[in-house]
Design a protein with these regions (language model features):
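Short, basic/aromatic recognition patches
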Residues: 207-211
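Active-site- and interface-proximal helix/loop "cap" or "latch" segments in soluble metabolic
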Residues: 1-166, 212-298
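Short, compositionally biased leader-like segments
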Residues: 167-206
Length: 298
């Protein structure tokens, strides 16, 4: 057995970038956009969805960017249109793959782009302004988060009961702005995100890198994997920006417990057990999982 990256394509380095944005449509829908690019192609997707708590896909569209890859989902706009009526809930990726066709050329890349767009639905919402303080404290922001996205409860340390008392401590900083909770209709770039992933192969080791930067997050993650034994040799992370600086920090560093773990097809359960849950960080878990998803075991 060994661990391989299906995207190295005979080379020793693979890189992809993702840009994402949220616009607020005049009628109140959120337009979630993402562009995913690598050496093969670039694809743009957009989802018009109802804000929380609905998360209903009203419209979906997308297109390959020049140079268009030959033979890869040439009917992409038609296939994406079939996403209308779905909801951005757990299992959405699987539904997207079913709609695109799991064996269709380019389907995996498009599905990744659609999921990146869908994730932005948990960054911008439209709350009743009467529920939003003019000068919110960190605890107020947490209350707004749980009002908008109740599914966050116990999803990570920050949204667990164990962290509540910490919000009264000095030094807790929140980079979010009220525009993310009560954006005006027609607002452009209410939220924007940039991600970069890289996988390099050298001397029997795969080095995995992932970064994500937006208004409220700054993550950089590195993992070294032994190709033959499939063991994680080293793990490192930098988190210069977090939604609740002074609180989210306490869930970081759990990647160190991944060192020595042997990766196989069961990695999703193992990863969630180590870095997720009420003591963990779901963004950290997602970013790591996105890297591991690019691997296969032979």
């Amino acid at each position: 057995m060994s661990v391989v990256c299906r995207l190295l394509d005979g080379t020793d380095r693979y890189e992809r970038t993702v840009t994402g944005s949220v616009d607020v449509r005049p009628e109140g829908l959120l337009r979630l956009g993402a562009r995913l690019s690598d050496h093969r192609a670039s694809v743009d997707v957009s989802l018009d969805v109802t804000p929380s708590p609905g998360f209903d896909v009203v419209r979906a569209d997308g297109a390959w960017r020049p140079p268009e890859p030959a033979g890869q989902l040439e009917d992409l706009p038609d296939r994406l249109a079939r996403l209308a009526g779905l909801r951005l809930f757990p299992g959405f990726r699987r539904r997207v793959v079913d709609v695109l066709g799991p064996d269709a050329p380019g389907a995996a890349q498009v599905a990744d782009a659609v999921v990146e767009a869908a994730r932005l639905s948990r960054q911008v919402t439209r709350l009743d302004p009467r529920h939003v303080p003019a000068d919110p404290t960190p605890l107020d922001f947490r209350r707004l988060d749980l009002m908008a996205w109740p599914e966050f409860s116990d999803m990570c340390f920050t949204y667990s009961a164990a962290s509540t008392s910490l919000f009264e401590e000095p030094g807790v900083r929140v980079p979010a702005t009220l525009d993310m909770y009560v954006p005006r209709p027609g607002a452009r770039l209410a939220f924007h995100r940039y991600k970069r992933a890289e996988i390099a192969r050298a001397d029997g080791v795969l080095t995995l890198y992932q970064s994500m930067f937006d208004q409220v997050h700054g993550f950089e993650l590195w993992y070294d994997l032994d190709i033959q034994t499939q063991r994680i040799l080293r793990a490192r992370a930098l988190t210069p920006r977090l939604p609740y600086m002074g609180i989210c920090d306490q869930a970081q560093g759990r990647n160190q417990t991944l060192i020595g773990m042997t990766l196989d097809e069961r990695w999703p359960t193992a990863l969630r057990g180590v870095t997720g849950g009420r003591l963990g960080c779901f963004q950290f878990t997602d970013l790591t999982g996105d890297l591991f998803r690019l691997l296969s075991f032979e």
